[in-house]
């Protein structure tokens, strides 16, 4: 998305009331919405710097407004706007964070829950993904192989097996070791 011109949503809701499904902003989003609608799998990938998805991804998500219509729906006490067309895509969310602990992904998890992701990959201790440390590299390589298997299973089966889901959450390093690795 960084290479696409995507203006910020103005909140004018012309895409709902004046010209349903059409945004007044003229940028690359029209083509991206077309690709989004034609895709079998939608992937949202973002690092966590502070609490949630980056502004780049949030801007894209905000610009999905033309895919909604101004009719409220309720499901299990949660309210949202009705989709113009039923979602048939599977959603995949991938994120990493430099801090240890899974709590760093709570806001993102809540933000994407509405799209009911088929696969969520959250990697804490993200600084290890670029390390040259031989001890950490071995564990990172092992984890990356699991990520590849998860992707393959997602493409072929439409979901991932329980053993892959569990392996995606493998600890790369203890919090104490990671703090020492960071020099903290």
Task: Label the predicted regions.
Residues 1-69, 137-184:
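N-terminal beta1-alpha1-beta2 submodule of the flavodoxin-like/Rossmannoid cofactor-binding fold
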Residues 22, 102, 123-124:
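A generic secondary-structure micro-motif detector
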Residues 46, 95-98, 125:
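Generic secondary-structure microfeatures
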Residues 56, 70-119:
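Short, glycine-/small-residue-rich phosphate/pyrophosphate-handling segment
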Residues 119-127:
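Beta-strand-loop-alpha "switch" segments that mediate conformational coupling across diverse proteins
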Residues 127-133:
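A short acidic, helix-capping loop that chelates divalent metal ions and anchors anionic groups
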């Amino acid at each position: 998305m960084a290479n696409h011109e995507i203006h910020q949503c103005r909140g004018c809701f012309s895409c709902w009331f004046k010209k349903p499904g059409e945004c007044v902003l003229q940028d690359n989003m029209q083509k991206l919405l077309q690709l989004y609608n034609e895709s079998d799998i939608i992937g949202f990938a973002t690092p966590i710097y502070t609490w949630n998805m980056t502004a780049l991804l949030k801007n894209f998500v905000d610009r999905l407004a033309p895919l909604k219509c101004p009719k409220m729906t309720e499901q299990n006490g949660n309210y949202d706007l009705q989709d113009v067309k039923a979602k048939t895509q599977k959603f995949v969310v991938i994120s990493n964070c430099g801090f240890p602990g899974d709590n760093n992904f709570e806001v993102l998890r809540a933000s994407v829950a509405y799209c009911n992701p088929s696969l969520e990959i959250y990697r804490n201790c993200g600084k290890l993904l670029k390390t040259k440390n031989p001890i950490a590299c071995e564990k990172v390589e092992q984890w990356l192989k699991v990520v590849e298997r998860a992707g393959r299973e997602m493409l072929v089966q439409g979901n991932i097996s329980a053993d892959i889901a569990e392996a995606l959450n493998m600890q790369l390093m203890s919090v104490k070791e990671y703090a020492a690795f960071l020099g903290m």
